[in-house]
Structures are given as C-alpha cells and as structure tokens.
Amino acid sequence: MASATASISSHSVALRDLKAARIGAVKQQVAAAPAAGTAAARAQRARAVRPLRAAEPARQPVSASAAAAPAAAPVAEDAAAAAVDAPAPAVDYEALAQELQGASPLEIMDRALAMFGSDIAIAFSGAEDVALIEYAKLTGRPFRVFSLDTGRLNPETYQLFDKVEKHYGIRIEYMFPDAGEVQALVRAKGLFSFYEDGHQECCRARKVRPLRRALRGLRAWITGQRKDQSPGTRAAIPVVQVDPSFEGLAGGAGSLVKWNPVANVDGKDVWTFLRAMDVPVNALHAQGYVSIGCEPCTRPVLPGQHEREGRWWWEDAKAKECGLHKGNIDDQGGAAAAAAHKAGGANGNGSAGAPDIFESSGVVSLTRAGVENLLRLESRAEPWLVVLYAPWCPFCQAMEASYLELAERLGGAGGGVKVGKFRADGEQKAFAQQELQLQSFPTILLFPSRTARPIKYPSEKRDVDSLLAFVNSLR
C-alpha cells in the first residue's frame, strides 16, 4: 500500500473542490425548497444527531416552522415516510474490506463518514491517532471525536486534547469511568493493583465500560489501530469490519461497524504525514514515548525496542491489550491456553498433560536444588542462561525453536555459556516469584560468572539475535 503521504495532497485538493461544489449545490436546493411538511419533519427526526452517551437516540422535536407548514399531498407524504422508514440495504463488510484494502487512509475515512454521517465518531487517545482527525478534516465532511478520560492520563495528554480542540475548532466528547466502580476498586486493592495482578481489571473499569457506553450511541466508530503496532496481536486487522466485541445503537451482535483507516500504514509513514501537515502532537513523543496510555502504565522505549514495550512492560506481549480491541487479538494459543497463562498454573502444574519443551542435549534441565545452588554462588566457572517456563504456556512454546538454536550457538566452540531451563509453574511458582523475579512466562535469566544476582532479560523479542546480544553484552 502506498504510504499516507504519497496520496495526501491529491486527495485533499480533490476533496476540497468537492466540498465547495457540495456547498453550492446545497445553497441552491435550500433556496428552491418548498415549505417542509410532515414528511420533511419525519426525515428531520431520522437524521437527528444521537448523543454519544445515550443507549437510545434522543428524538429531536419538530420545529415550530415545520409544524405550522401546510401538509403535503398524502401520496407524497406516504412515499417520503416509506423512504425514511425503509431499512438500509445490508452491507457485506468483508467484501468492502477487500475493496478498500489498497485504498489510502483518506479514501477510507471519506467512505466511513459518507456512510454513517453523525452516527460515527473517531476514538482519540491523545497519541499519534491525531492523524485520524486530520484525515477527517481533509474530507470536508462533518465529524465527531470522542476520548476516554481514565483520570490517570499524563498532563501532556490533557494539554494535547486542548490543542486539538482549538486547532480543529471541535469539541471532543469525553467519556469518564463510573466513580463508584473506581472507588470500590481502589479501596479494595489500592492505587497500583495492576502491578500485582495485571492491568485488565483496572482497564475494564476505566476504559472498557466507558467505551461500551459511548458505542451504544453510535452505529460505527473509527480507530487508529495499525497492524505494525503489535504484530503478535494486531496482525489481522481489516480496514473495516463488523465489530466483534461491542454493540451499537440498534443493540445486539452486528449492530456496530469498526473502521481502521490506518490498519495497513507503517508507523513511520504516519509520522511523516503528521510532520507534513504540521498538526499538534503529544509532547511525550519527544521524550521517547511511542505508544501512550495511562501514566502509571506507559514509559519511554529505547531505540530498537518495539513501541508496545512501553506499555504494561511487566506483562507478556499478548497480554498487552486493554480490552478496547480484544476482538482483533490473534489468539494463536487459544482461549484455554491464555486462561492458563493468566492463572500461572495455580492449579497444580497448570496443564499436567502438556508435553515438556526445550528438550535438547544442549539445554540442561535444572531442579530446584540446582537453581538454588546457582543463586548461592558469587562466582561461577562460566555464565548460565536459564529460562523459567511452563510447558503449557503458548509464549514458551513459541520461543522453543529460537532458544534451542541459541543453545547450540552458545554451547559450541567459543560459546562458553551454559544454557538451562527450570519449570517454574505449579508448586515451584511461589519460589520462582520470590527468588527468581518471575512475573510471567517465559522469564529468561542470565547468571553472570562474576555477579551473584541473576539479570532478567527485559525485552519481549525472543529471537536468537536479540537473546544473543543480551548475553554477549553481560557475560
């Protein structure tokens, strides 16, 4: 797909000309229009803007001028009423996604706004998704923007909200969490419980439920999801889809459409577009932040790190979704494996029937006594690299091939590093959490030859080259 910047100028010029033509046509129609009758009043009600917060649309009252206007002919009235009340033709959104697969973000945005009018809104998080607002402006169509204020955003994010409103002349429709629910959570578990038992509970209260309320007042929404944001969980995002997780205005499954105009755009191209259009951006980006969320759960990333490594860094890669886009998660391990991973093998050994992994002559299977011995030594004959794993964990299974290849390279001539594994689920989990820095599976530790305390591998990149660079920098 061509980058966002490659197509922006031609589309923006064309759409501005189109907008001018539309305005002229509308003025002529208004001047020639007869007085509105009952049918026009019905059409007005059908087009009424639905409030974002409401579960059901609010009916706009008929204006005094419309009420006083003479009634139209019965035949014309019946025809107009039938046109207003007739159900919209069904849309095959899978086919539409294929049709728009090669379209630019501007074209996709224009199609979305044209199809849904005031019943669609842009979800704005205060990060680089400001590009969505710029694309919407360039279409020349009216648009709405909403945002989730969790109460724990960075000051820079709130400052960006204000700048965006002034820059585009809009009012962002803010959604807030239920005060009673947040109060109960904080009183029961404290302000930072997500560091201990995961972020999902906090995100449900502060983000997911407010989003659900917002979407019940819409027929469609627009997100800034990109495939390259999280290749492990967002690789299959289409540009448009029936929302698999949330309900819209009509209620029930299939009542909400989700648009992802930048799904196929590379993050670098998004930033090229933002700089070219000179739009306001979050000041945190200049401080090394890429993916931006709540202040306690967001941090800068280093050069070479993936942007999602700055979010919920204490959890595994596939746990790094707050729930807003859970329907797009590519769950390669299956729901059962994900549930077992979250439980951490609390029941016995997690999945007792799972075959063992990391089996190779180059990988030493350590017992608890062996690990305790490694911990006691202040000086070792050679470094040790040890993976703490659970055989049922899909993330452990996914790194098996790279770990075995690493063992061959480190154990060969000139390698000089012992490679081991320690099964840390079940009855060994408490020990691993207390003594071995275990928070999630897999955890990789390097025991240097001249340092007593093991060093935990900080990244989620578990390919051979990344692991080898970690070992060589500390051995």
Swiss-Prot record:
GO terms under cellular component: chloroplast
Any one GO BP annotation for this protein: sulfate assimilation, phosphoadenylyl sulfate reduction by phosphoadenylyl-sulfate reductase (thioredoxin)
GO: which molecular function terms? 4 iron, 4 sulfur cluster binding; adenylyl-sulfate reductase (glutathione) activity; metal ion binding; phosphoadenylyl-sulfate reductase (thioredoxin) activity
Q: Can you say what this protein is called?
A: Probable 5'-adenylylsulfate reductase 1, chloroplastic
This protein's gene is called APR1
- Which Gene3D superfamilies has this protein been placed in? Glutaredoxin, HUPs
Entry cofactors: [4Fe-4S] cluster
Q: Which reaction does it catalyse?
A: glutathione disulfide + sulfite + AMP + 2 H(+) = adenosine 5'-phosphosulfate + 2 glutathione
